[in-house]
Amino acid sequence: MNCLTDTHALLWWFTDSPKISPKATNLFDKCEKGEITIFIPSIVVAEALSVFDKKRISFNFKKLFKQINDSENFVLVALDYPILQKMVDLKDIPELHDKIIVSTAMYLNLPIITKDKHLQTLSYIKTIW
């Protein structure tokens, strides 16, 4: 089952954080083995850079970005018109980055790997944690 990741899940997997759930870890492991594809909204990479710049967690951003770029099983998704169209109707999501992530998941019809409690309550998307 292909899916889409949010920033926390991606960074916690990349840094081997104990904060990541077993289900999420399993999905990233399957992606590394080529069994599934994980889609990464461009805002997730931008947020990862912001986390790196602010030194909120320690990791090698260039290594993460290279791994995403070099992998056939991680797919970077640009923010474009169809995704922006979906964002217009998302009045119940206050954070811009979450709107972009949810809109991207809706556009691609994919579940989101996320620990975000607010996103988990939304009836119109599927989340995995």
Language model: regions and residue ranges:
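Short, well-structured N-terminal submotif of metal-dependent ribonuclease cores
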Residues: 1-40, 53-67, 122
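Acidic, PIN/NYN-like endoribonuclease modules and their adjacent C-terminal/linker elements
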Residues: 2, 71, 102-129
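Conserved glycosyltransferase catalytic-site signature
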Residues: 7, 42, 81, 98-99
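Acidic catalytic patch
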Residues: 16, 42, 46, 65-91
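Residue-level detector of anion-binding/catalytic polar loops
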Residues: 37, 75, 111
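General small-molecule cofactor/ligand-binding pocket signal
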Residues: 39, 77, 128
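Donor nucleotide-sugar recognition loop
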Residues: 92-97
